[in-house]
C-alpha cells in the first residue's frame, strides 16, 4: 500500500483528505490510482494531517518508487 493510500485510510477517505487539502476528491483518486503518489506540494500537509502516522519520508518514497 502506498503512503498516499495509507493517508487516505487514516483520514477517513478520499473526500476527507481532499477537503483538508482544498482539492477535489477526483484529484485524490488520481493520485492513488494513476500516479501512486501525492504531488510534492501537498506532502507536508498530508503528513501533518495524519499527525505523523505517515511521514514526509514515506510520502517522498512514493515518488522514488515510481521513477
Enumerate the predicted regions with their spans.
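Short, charged recognition helix plus adjacent turn
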Residues: 2-5, 15, 19, 25-26, ...
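Short amphipathic helical patch at the helix-1/turn junction of helix-turn-helix
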Residues: 8-9
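Short glycine/proline-centered loop/turn elements that form peptide/ligand docking sites
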Residues: 12
Amino acid at each position: 500500500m502506498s503512503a498516499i493510500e495509507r493517508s487516505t485510510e487514516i483520514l477517513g477517505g478520499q473526500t476527507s483528505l481532499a477537503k483538508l487539502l482544498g482539492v477535489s476528491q477526483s484529484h485524490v483518486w488520481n493520485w492513488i490510482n494513476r500516479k501512486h503518489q501525492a504531488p510534492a506540494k501537498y506532502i507536508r500537509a498530508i503528513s501533518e494531517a495524519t499527525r505523523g502516522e505517515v511521514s514526509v519520508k514515506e510520502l517522498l518514497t512514493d515518488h522514488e518508487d515510481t521513477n
